UniProtKB/Swiss-Prot annotation:
Keyword field: Cell cycle, Cell division, GTP-binding, Magnesium, Metal-binding, Nucleotide-binding, Septation
GO biological process: division septum assembly
GO molecular function: GTP binding; metal ion binding
Species annotation: Polynucleobacter asymbioticus (strain DSM 18221 / CIP 109841 / QLW-P1DMWA-1) (Polynucleobacter necessarius subsp. asymbioticus)
UniProt cross-references to PROSITE patterns, sorted A to Z: G_ENGB
Names of required cofactors: Mg(2+)
Domain EngB-type G as annotated: residue spans: 23-211
Keyword Iron: no
Chain sites annotated for binding Mg(2+): S38, T60
Transport among keywords: no
One term under GO cellular component: cytosol
Protein function: Necessary for normal cell division and for the maintenance of normal septation.
The protein's name in its UniProt record: Probable GTP-binding protein EngB
Family under the similarity heading: Belongs to the TRAFAC class TrmE-Era-EngA-EngB-Septin-like GTPase superfamily. EngB GTPase family.
Length: 221
């Protein structure tokens, strides 16, 4: 059983000054409104309504923290960031979201990686690129889940994944000529509905959150 199955709601904040004052590792989930972020969180944690998928895009305006527990011991956090890209949101709200997201992604020391949910049918959008550009300078990993891949046929899935991986090369400072396989920015196919790619995503998130712990266990054994 995955450690993510033990996730439960911890807190919600609307300002970076209110973020939990703990040294625990965090993995952030980001994505456009309606890209399938809440569904991805729910299926990865094997829960139906851990993250609330609003029928009104852009409604979630806070950073939601979900703690991963072992009985009553808090081990780490999954962090649900506000969805972005919904046109009906007013300018003031958009400005607040941008400031909140950029500050969190660029300055949060406890953040060890970002899972970016991208609709496989749309590919990486300009706003997705903005998220990547905010986060890449930290040197921390970004993993893209190409969601709703069940809506594409096998050939379309292959091309969608190839296109995104090629696009990611240009953002990796370790690949100055824009070629080669990026280690910092990775991508996979994913479907919450058909449960495609769950194991791959789960393994990576667990690695980010508990890699040091696993290494220490190997040393002591």
């Amino acid at each position: 059983m995955s450690k993510l199955f033990q996730a439960r709601f911890a807190t919600t904040v609307n300002d970076t000054h209110c973020l939990p004052a703990t040294p625990l590792r965090e993995v952030a989930f980001a994505g456009r409104s309606n890209a399938g972020k809440s569904s991805a969180l729910n299926v990865l944690c094997n829960q139906k309504r851990l993250a609330f998928a609003s029928k009104t895009p852009g409604r979630t305006q806070h950073i939601n923290y979900f703690g991963i527990f072992a009985k009553d011991d808090l081990l780490a956090y999954l962090v649900d960031l506000p969805g972005y890209g919904y046109a009906a949101v007013n300018h003031e709200t958009k400005y607040h979201w941008n400031a909140l997201l950029s500050d969190y992604l660029q300055e949060r020391e406890q953040l060890v990686g970002m899972v970016l949910i991208v609709d496989a049918r749309r590919g990486i959008t300009e706003l997705d690129e903005q998220m990547i550009q905010w986060f890449v300078p930290t040197g921390k990993p970004i993993h893209i889940l190409l969601s709703k891949c069940d809506k594409l046929n096998k050939s379309e899935c292959k091309h969608a994944l190839e296109d995104v991986r090629k696009q990611l090369q240009q953002y990796d400072p370790a690949l100055p000529d824009g070629t080669g396989e990026s280690q910092q920015l990775t991508a996979q196919l994913f479907s919450s509905t058909k449960r495609i790619g769950l194991e791959e995503a789960d393994n990576l998130i667990i690695k980010w959150l508990f890699e040091a712990e696993t290494h220490e266990d190997e040393i002591t054994s």
